[in-house]
């Protein structure tokens, strides 16, 4: 398994988005250096280039660099963000007809350039993957999502995307059951750390109350990967206030990595 660190911040709507680069670097220091790669991210914000997507120029450059980095890997990749838009290239890299996508995220990321309140890509990335045909909507599971825009609710309903609430995640098999029922043969796991309860995990730009407990998320991942092979994974949105705060949250992130590695 190879770790690919992508300290991208340009997809975030937050005025403190640069903390995402700090978070990616903090995670990198806990990873085995021999099996870790780093994708360079432009220093500049980038412009929208007529797309309606803020900072699109830089986001597209990073997507291409990440795609190139993944192409040369001999094994499964865990991509470390940065903002959660890094999952775009990572999911496309492993796309096939049997792929399921589990999206652990407080937000569904189902906006488009015409519906997004912020115009930033982190809130559009899942919609973009569906539009590109990278994954069948019937094999997408949103888990732990609890803050929706109206347009996102409409898209999830129209596409038939399955949803598992925070309460339903008390059953460690809930996600695995939904994925297996879809007929998938392998699974990509996207984890935006804001899916976690901010009372347990502090390093977030936009903490949303009443999230998933770490023990529940770890148990869910283990159950899922006990039933289907892992195609790849993302851990994104770590944004510690300081190096000291990063140390406090590190054990949680390492538990999630251990669950993904099996």
Protein language model annotation of sequence segments:
Residues 122, 143-148, 168-170, 213:
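A general structural motif
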Residues 76-139, 228-231:
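Active-site histidine-anchored catalytic micro-motif
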Residues 23, 122-125, 152:
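Internal, well-ordered alpha-helical segments in soluble enzyme and binding-protein domains
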Residues 1-78, 93, 155-157, 162-262:
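Catalytic cores of soluble, metal-dependent hydrolases
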Residues 148-154:
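Short, glycine/polar-rich helix-capping loops at beta-to-alpha or helix-loop-helix junctions
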């Amino acid at each position: 398994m190879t770790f690919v660190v992508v300290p991208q911040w340009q997809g975030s709507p937050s005025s403190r988005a640069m903390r995402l680069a700090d978070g990616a670097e903090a995670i990198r220091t806990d990873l085995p250096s021999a099996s870790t790669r780093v994708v360079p991210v432009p220093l500049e914000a980038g412009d929208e280039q007529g797309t309606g997507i803020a900072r699109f120029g830089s986001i597209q450059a990073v997507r291409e660099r990440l795609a190139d980095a993944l192409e040369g890997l001999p094994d499964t990749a865990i991509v470390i963000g940065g903002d959660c838009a890094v999952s775009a290239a990572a999911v496309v890299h492993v796309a096939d007809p049997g792929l399921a996508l589990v999206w652990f995220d407080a937000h569904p990321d189902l906006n488009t350039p015409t519906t997004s309140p912020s115009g930033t890509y982190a809130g559009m990335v899942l919609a973009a993957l569906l539009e590109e045909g990278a994954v069948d909507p019937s094999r997408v599971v949103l888990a732990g999502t609890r803050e929706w825009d109206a347009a996102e609710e409409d898209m999830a309903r129209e596409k038939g995307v399955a949803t598992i609430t925070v309460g339903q995640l008390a059953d460690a098999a809930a996600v695995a059951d939904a994925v297996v029922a879809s007929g998938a043969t392998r699974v990509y796991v996207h984890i935006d750390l804001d899916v976690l309860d901010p009372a347990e995990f502090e390093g977030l730009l936009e903490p949303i109350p009443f999230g998933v407990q770490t023990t529940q998320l770890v148990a869910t991942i283990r159950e899922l990967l006990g039933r289907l092979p892992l195609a790849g994974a993302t851990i994104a949105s770590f944004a510690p206030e300081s190096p000291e705060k990063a140390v406090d949250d590190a054990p949680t992130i390492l538990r999630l990595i251990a669950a993904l590695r099996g």
